[in-house]
Each structure stands twice: as C-alpha cells, then as structure tokens.
Amino acid sequence: MTKVRTKISLKIGANSRIPAQIASFNGLTSDKEHIAIIFGKADECSSSPIVRIHSECLTGDVFHSSRCDCGEQLDEAIELMEKEGGIIIYLRQEGRGIGLYNKIDAYKLQSEGMDTYQANNQLGFEDDLRDFTEAGQMLAALNIRKLQLLTNNPLKVKALREYGITVDKVISTSTFIKDDNESYLRTKAKNAGHAIRFPF
C-alpha cells in the first residue's frame, strides 16, 4: 500500500515566495521518486481540490524549451493553486516515459521532419509509455477521493476514474503556442485527443 513517507514545508515559484508542501511516498509500484506538491490545505479538506498530474520535462520545466508547453503548464498550475489551493502530482516520466536521452534523440528526428509520435516509434517506443496508476496511488495516500483535474489529456482522466477516483470536473489548461511547438501541439490534439484550444 502506498503511504506518505515524508512531508516538508518550503516556498517555491518565482522568487521562492509561494508556500507549499512536498510529499514523498513509500510503496509505489515503480522505483520512480514521484512527489506531490501541496498548496494550502488541499489534502485536508473534504471538498474537491484542483489537481494537476504533471510528467517531468527537464527541457520545458527547467529550461523553458521552445519545443513544448510543459513549463508554461506547470507555471500555470502553480499560479492557480497559489490562489485556489490544490495538488500537483509530479511524475518522473521524462519524454512520455522514454527518458531524457531518448527524448533528445527524438528531438533530432523531429528536426529532420518526423512528428513527436513518429520519432518515438522510430526509436522503438510506443506513442506514450506513461502509466498514471501511481498518480492514483499517491492521491489515495493523501486521502483524495474526488477532485477537479487540470489537464487537456483524456488518458489522465480515464486513469484516475479507473483507479476509483471521482473526477468532478476537467479544467482545460491554457494553450501556449510558440514558433517551435505549434506542430507538436496540433499532433497531440490530432493523435491523442488532447483538448487543446487553438486560436486559429
């Protein structure tokens, strides 16, 4: 059974000004060191907190790469939860589960004309290797049984519902279009059903 291992308080975000808690876990089904970032008392209330399941993206989250919108989505979640409370489930699933080096290899193939899924397939991987079951385990360990999910990805909604967690509402993330990521976003919408709103 998954249980909270350690929970600490710290400040995060720009200028380290946003109070939050970081929780680690024992008993996850993989050896990945996933964490939960808790804002306010989202894990102590009986209502339906806002939750974002966010897969690690070093190039986007840390270096704000122009190739994706991951960093902007993470920043948006932090800003929203600073005001409303909530929980970010941060999963160590770099490159939709293929790892950082393989993702960089995939980027090279994309530069040669492949889309994000074709590149993964060329490297011998499926379109998306992520499993969101552990997100359900972590939320259950935090006593979260119902929530509002901040996502454009229907697979995350499906995974939580299959785990027995009630998704009261799906909140779409904003669309962050940059010169280098429009094709990537349109491919996710077309191939994986992401509910991305394009202005044109």
From Swiss-Prot:
One Gene Ontology cellular component annotation held by this UniProt entry: cytosol
GO molecular function: GTP binding; GTP cyclohydrolase II activity; zinc ion binding
Pathway: Cofactor biosynthesis; riboflavin biosynthesis; 5-amino-6-(D-ribitylamino)uracil from GTP: step 1/4
Enzyme type, top EC level: hydrolase
Cofactor or coenzyme needed: Zn(2+)
Residue stretches in coiled coil: none
Residue positions binding Zn(2+): 57, 68, 70
GO terms under biological process: riboflavin biosynthetic process
Superkingdom of origin: Bacteria
Cofactor descriptive note: Binds 1 zinc ion per subunit.
EC number: 3.5.4.25
Pfam families on file: GTP_cyclohydro2
Catalytic activity: GTP + 4 H2O = 2,5-diamino-6-hydroxy-4-(5-phosphoribosylamino)-pyrimidine + formate + 2 phosphate + 3 H(+)
Catalytic residue list: 128, 130
Stated role: Catalyzes the conversion of GTP to 2,5-diamino-6-ribosylamino-4(3H)-pyrimidinone 5'-phosphate (DARP), formate and pyrophosphate.
UniProt-listed HAMAP family: RibA
Family: Belongs to the GTP cyclohydrolase II family.
UniProt protein name: GTP cyclohydrolase-2
Organism from which the protein derives: Psychromonas ingrahamii (strain DSM 17664 / CCUG 51855 / 37)
